[in-house]
Amino acid sequence: PRPSTTAAVVADLRSSLQSEKATDAAAIIKSLSESGIHSADPQSWTGVAQLSTTEPISPGNAPVAVSPSSAESFTECGMKWFLEKSGGTDGDSIAQVLGSAIHAFAALMVQEEGITEAVLVEKLKKSWNLIDPQEGWVSKTSQEKAIAMITRFMKYHMKHEREVVGVELGFDVTVGKARIRGTVDRLEVDSAGNLFVIDFKTSKTPISYEKAEQNLQLKSYQIAVAEGGFTAQHASTTSSGAALIYLGHDIQKISSREQGVINLEEARAEIENIAQSMGAAQFVAATNSRCKECPVKSSCPIKAEGRTVIE
């Protein structure tokens, strides 16, 4: 039997609102609400209250901040992007902390003199408790994989043909409504004086070559080059491309995905359209391969976990 609580009584009365007892049920609910029973107040019922606002996030010509990674994630699922932007994210995972550490060690190779692979590995081991405070074989295996990432990075660093301009370089450029801000892992210049952006990835699985050519994160970097985002470090505003370098891929050979020189006019229009959508009042939820591990699926209207009780 249903427990004899005020919430249960109200629930029974609400279920009667669609029956021949509707008039009596409504009168009792009204009386309970006037007596201070919160669950009897229709304004507390999910699906009854009006939207708090229908105004766009960024009205008119107000700029919209677009990071290179958010441009990519927004096109995958606008709802996920909005919920995460609004605070719907978990704390940093060990994988995220490790990724940040590997990027920092890769930057040290350029920023400090006398850095060798052995030095980087030693720094990693000394700071491991900060990355993964757990003990046991799982942590040990993770550390071995991290050391392998450093080895792969060193192979790339020693064999690359372009000159390093700088590492961990921030940029801030404006394209229409979009204010593109971010940081590149590494900026290189080729023999012709053109700039090439490198983004290190610690994930294991590279995207396809076709997806790399359309990757919005890399396109954003190339737009930043063209818009003078790195003129403080190098005079060139000509891009010769960009690449994702996968340090976590379990093979001896460095796995990379390059993006050739883009059509700047088309890329700018693409980013501007994304900025317009990011500043809108509504966001579309989309089903894709990342739904299974999505941290905000409990709020997603197209997933069972996130549907409202009133459709």
Regions found by a protein language model. Name each.
Residues 79, 94, 98, 102, ...:
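Hydrophobic (often cysteine-bearing) scaffold residues that line and stabilize catalytic clefts
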Residues 63-67, 82-91, 105-108, 128-137, ...:
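Glycine- and acidic
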Residues 13, 17, 21, 224-311:
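Metal-dependent nuclease catalytic regions and adjoining charged, substrate-binding loops involved
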Residues 1-111, 309-311:
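C-terminal, charged and often intrinsically disordered regions of DNA end-processing helicases
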Residues 169-269:
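Mg2+/Mn2+-dependent nuclease catalytic core
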